[in-house]
Amino acid sequence: MNLQALIEDIRQQVLPFYDQGRVADYIPALASVPPHQFGIAIHTLDGREHACGDADTPFSIQSISKAFMLALTLQADGEQLWRHVGKEPSGNPFNSLVQLEYEHGIPRNPFINAGALVVTDRAIGHFGDAHARLLAWLREETGNAGLMADQAIAASERAHGDRNAALAHFMKSYGNLGHPVETVLDQYFHNCSIAMSCRELARAGLFLANHGLSPQTGTQYLSRSQAKQVNAVMLTCGTYDAAGEFAYRVGLPVKSGVGGGLLAVIPGKMAIAAWSPQLDARGNSVLGLEALDRFTTRTGLSIF
């Protein structure tokens, strides 16, 4: 199968979907991103790379960082982590307070904002500077020593992060955050503000397709069981309240971010990253979903 020709053809098929979504505007620094961009990149376990479009343009990975933070923290915390955060889909918006109150400060899963704040808090307990640890890992996996958080986006998120602050204070009141709220928020916002390209993101995510083992560095980041767990939570919770649609149309573990990125995993084969900044009503990339749908439909590569 000629994957390069396939993704180039898919790119042409999805470009007409421009303007069927809108760029995230609740974070002002994201609102200024030019909307008509699309990139896709594939990294396979046997070392092949395919990319087209704007695959080398860095973008804010936003909530995709939560998948990497979950992996880092699960490696350090083990099963203890699941006493502080659940594994179930929420069915609510990613920044909802309602469910958190009903469930006494235990977030439903690690990928809604409340859950990611708890994971960050647990990571701080193990690494001190969890953001620095995440950056070091991503730099090693991508080979980009200059990979950084976008400070303008981090500052913009902090200035407009009252809902996240409310979530953190609420969980703190239930004893489910062990560190100062400001410390947790600062590291969380900086994680979300990391800028990566599709090529880099697919390369960094490849360990999830390889039972937790990085093909690039030979590092075993997760046990086989833990890699299965992360992929499972990505499948059921990784695209917020659109997880059912993604499972139906794409059939892969996927993590999305409001920067317009998507990271998809085909266990035993490859990782795929797609990016286009215009989002649907649920906060997922319009063109990214269309591209992944076409890719799995035409290749037959899904977990189902």
UniProtKB/Swiss-Prot annotation:
InterPro entries tied to this protein: Beta-lactam/transpept-like, Glutaminase
Catalytic reactions on record: L-glutamine + H2O = L-glutamate + NH4(+)
GO biological process terms held by the UniProt record: glutamate biosynthetic process; glutamine catabolic process
Binding-site residues for substrate, renumbered to this chain: S63, N113, E157, N164, Y188, Y240, V258
Annotated EC: 3.5.1.2
Keyword entries, A-Z: Hydrolase
Signal peptide (from-to): none
Pfam families in alphabetical order: Glutaminase
GO MF annotations in UniProt: glutaminase activity
Superkingdom as given in the UniProt entry: Bacteria
Family: Belongs to the glutaminase family.
NCBIfam families per UniProt: Gln_ase, PRK00971.1-1, PRK00971.1-2
Record PANTHER family: GLUTAMINASE
Subunit-level organization: Homotetramer.
Name of this chain's protein: Glutaminase
